[in-house]
């Protein structure tokens, strides 16, 4: 990390429609700007609510991005206006979340989308959740608030979060926006920020074991075989041992060179587009769609469970439903592999616009890990998007 840059955390607001996610997002920027000017600036409700549409993996999603910072950290915060946008955002990973702020209205308590968002957060690997009970200004009865809090803690525990240990802050985003910066409701916003400050920083991609997906393979006369691609995580140095995983039997080799923009380097790291020279490997021994990895860090599998979102017709998806044993292509990292979908028991068919859990059996083994995102394609177009929730042996 460059000197002077604050550690960075990705945050997202989740919760039922109209419980106040967008108002809270506006209140966070407003209170922090009043209290700790710095790089903070007020972002109003309307600016967040009319979020621009973005395309991620062929899917259109409306997402608002705001940022704010504290003395010690920088936060990138994502808020989606519509429920469908949340589902799509979380499954495609268009905006990653290290921590989610669960917003629950004190007047309603937990609602169906509250549950759905918590489940999805767990499925897509959001490690931490902090909770904001909103609209507390309109609930006179302290006991009512305690019941809502208890209910939310129980719900979080049911979905595998630490319901007893999670920070729950009671406040009113609207009141915090209306009052002066040292008022009691603004203090509640600062209490929520304090809960975010306690979240452990995520492990940076650079500090994880090396992995790179192969995009292309070249033969350089006199030097050997070079594979190119973007380094997904970790660092590779000249002399490191690497495994070639997926599509075929595992091969082990050594990196004899790292190149970027035709310059020889000693190392390549997460985020770099690099060429890796491999010892004793012929051009025909390796192909697009395999991965290079630190020894023993990833294996290839043919089956997994996943959470998927199936595009609507208006999004360029299918016009008709599909049934169990539907066989599309799964675009995983840099390769398309045919596979068949098994629907959960009790689900007869899947309509465009649905999201659900499925099991997939691939025709060929591919390097897979939990949390990996993929596209579902048919005839060259994206018809769905998913994330692996469990690897099946």
Curated annotation (Swiss-Prot):
It is found in: Cytoplasm. Residues 6-204 form the tr-type G domain. The keyword Protein biosynthesis applies. GO terms for cellular component: cytosol. One of its GO terms (molecular function) is GTP binding. Keywords: Cytoplasm, Elongation factor, GTP-binding, Hydrolase, Magnesium, Metal-binding, Nucleotide-binding, Protein biosynthesis. GTP binds at residues 15-22, 79-83, 134-137. It comes from the Bacteria. Mg(2+) binds at residue 22. Residues 172-174 are annotated as: G5. Residues 134-137 are annotated as: G4. Residues 15-22 are annotated as: G1. Residues 58-62 are annotated as: G2. Belongs to the TRAFAC class translation factor GTPase superfamily. Classic translation factor GTPase family. EF-Tu/EF-1A subfamily. Monomer. This is Elongation factor Tu. The gene is tuf1.
């Amino acid at each position: 990390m460059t000197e002077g840059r604050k550690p960075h955390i990705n945050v997202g607001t989740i919760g039922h429609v109209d419980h106040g996610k967008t108002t809270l997002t506006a209140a966070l920027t407003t209170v922090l700007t009043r209290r700790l000017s710095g790089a903070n600036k007020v972002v109003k409700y309307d600016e967040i609510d009319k979020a621009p549409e973005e395309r991620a993996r062929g899917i259109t999603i409306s997402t608002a991005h705001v940022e704010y910072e504290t003395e010690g950290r920088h936060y990138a915060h994502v808020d989606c206006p519509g429920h469908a946008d949340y589902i799509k955002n979380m499954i495609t990973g268009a905006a990653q979340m290290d921590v989610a702020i669960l917003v629950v209205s004190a007047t309603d308590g937990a609602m169906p989308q509250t549950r759905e968002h918590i489940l999805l957060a767990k499925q897509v690997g959001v490690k931490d959740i902090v909770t904001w009970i909103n609209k507390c200004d309109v609930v006179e009865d302290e006991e009512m608030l305690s019941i809502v809090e208890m209910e939310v803690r129980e719900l979080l525990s049911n979905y595998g979060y630490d319901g007893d240990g999670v920070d729950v802050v009671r406040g009113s985003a609207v009141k915090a926006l209306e009052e002066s910066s040292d008022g009691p409701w603004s203090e509640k916003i600062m209490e929520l920020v304090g809960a975010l400050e306690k979240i452990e920083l995520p492990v940076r991609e650079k500090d994880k074991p090396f992995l790179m997906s192969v995009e292309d393979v070249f033969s350089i006369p006199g030097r050997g075989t070079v594979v190119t691609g973007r380094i997904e995580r970790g660092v590779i140095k000249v002399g490191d041992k690497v495994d070639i995983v997926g599509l075929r039997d595992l091969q082990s080799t050594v990196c004899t060179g790292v190149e970027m923009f035709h310059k020889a380097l000693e190392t390549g790291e997460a985020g770099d587009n690099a060429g890796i020279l491999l010892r004793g490997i012929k051009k025909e021994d390796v192909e697009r769609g395999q991965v290079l990895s630190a020894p023993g860090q990833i294996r290839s599998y043919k089956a997994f469970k996943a959470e998927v979102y199936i595009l609507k017709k208006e999004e360029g998806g299918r016009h008709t439903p599909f049934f169990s044993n539907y066989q599309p292509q799964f675009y995983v990292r840099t390769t398309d592999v045919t596979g068949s979908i098994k629907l959960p028991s009790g689900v007869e068919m899947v309509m465009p616009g649905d999201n659900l859990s499925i099991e997939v059996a691939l025709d060929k083994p591919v390097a897979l890990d939990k949390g990996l995102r993929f596209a579902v394609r048919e005839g060259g177009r994206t018809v769905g998007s998913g994330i692996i929730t469990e690897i099946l042996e």
